[in-house]
Design a protein with these regions (language model features):
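N-terminal glycine-rich phosphate-binding loop and ensuing alpha1 helix
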Residues: 1-58
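Residue-level signal for inorganic ion chemistry
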Residues: 6, 32, 90, 104-105, ...
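Conserved N-terminal catalytic core of the sugar/cofactor nucleotidyltransferase
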Residues: 33-98, 178
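Conserved alpha/beta core of the MobA/IspD/sugar-nucleotide pyrophosphorylase nucleotidyltransferase superfamily
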Residues: 157-246, 250, 257-258, 263, ...
């Protein structure tokens, strides 16, 4: 059984006056609802637990789960003081017998079933996997406003969610982190510190995390472009193409489309005695008429 924990307990301070980012409405629908839709439709996910602030539980149950018909939602639970605590609360609320879990940020609404499948497949090897993309920009180490080093970009990947783990492995990682008073930046870091090899599944640059007001117009644009369909098409290029951020597959598709000849309708023969709509009947010369047979088989003299 595969369960998903959708983490949306953050206060969204960087979102400013817009309020908690996971509940901001785009085209009349909360961001968290777009995210849940993907997991609701995915045949890979059996059930979900949503983690939100305590004072938002009833609103989420009524205005999100009930309004949008989320049948896979098993529970809506409150989050903790940190993301790590929130994930732990979500893990405890999953159905008994859950063997694998997918952790996902509620504010990454441009996730796709393809990414969920990819991270689940990658986690089969060691019990742990994340989605990530290669760094595109040069990364600097800075101290007190001064560059103290330049990182090798070829070795750097930007971690995303969804992340997938064997349930018992992730519970063990979280339990040990609490005992050791360790605060991890993501679930993979907790798995790493107990010696787990965490695999990487190629993510998507479109799988953005909505953290500030500047991200909202970007999501609105993606929404207008039907980004989920385009994302599924793009990531289906496979790890090599996606790792390069390669869009040549789309370009080739457009070229094939341009080269494709338009369908020609076959010309219909006009019936006897009727001319084509765009043509006047041709006047036949008397010599042509002599001895000719009309289409109706009557001989003319």
């Amino acid at each position: 059984m595969v369960g998903a924990v959708i983490v949306g307990a953050g206060e969204g301070k960087r979102m400013g006056a817009s309020g908690r980012k996971q509940f901001v409405k785009i085209a009349g629908k909360p961001i968290i609802a777009y995210t849940l839709d993907v997991f609701e439709r995915s045949p890979l996910i059996d059930h979900m637990v949503i983690v939100v602030p305590l004072d938002s539980i009833d609103w989420v149950k009524e205005d999100v789960v009930a309004t949008y018909g989320m049948k896979k939602v098993h529970a809506v639970v409150y989050g903790g003081a940190t993301r790590q605590e929130s994930v732990m609360n979500g893990l405890k609320a999953l159905k008994p017998g859950t063997q694998r879990v997918v952790i996902h940020d509620a504010v990454r609404p441009i996730v796709s079933d393809t990414l969920i499948r990819r991270v689940l497949d990658a986690a089969q090897k060691t019990g742990a996997a994340i989605t990530a993309v290669p760094a595109r920009d040069t990364v600097k180490r800075v101290e007190s406003g001064e560059i103290v080093g330049t990182m090798d970009r070829r070795l750097l990947w930007l971690a995303q969610t969804p992340q997938s783990f064997r349930y018992d492995l992730l519970m063990n990682a979280h339990t040990k982190a609490v005992a050791d008073k360790i605060e991890g930046t993501d679930d993979a870091s907790l798995a790493e510190r107990i010696g787990t090899k965490v695999m990487v599944a190629v993510g998507s640059y479109s799988n953005i995390k909505m953290t500030s007001p500047e991200d909202l117009p970007m999501f609105e644009y993606f929404l207008g472009q039907d980004v989920k369909a385009r994302l599924d098409s793009a990531v289906d290029q496979g790890p090599r193409g996606a790792a390069r951020g390669d869009t040549r597959g789309e370009a080739r598709g457009r070229q094939r489309h341009r080269r494709r000849r338009p369908h020609r309708r076959s010309a219909r023969k006009p019936e006897a005695g009727h001319a084509r709509p765009s043509e006047a009947p041709r006047q036949r010369h008397p010599k042509e008429m002599k001895g000719a047979h009309h289409r109706d088989g009557v001989r003319h003299s």
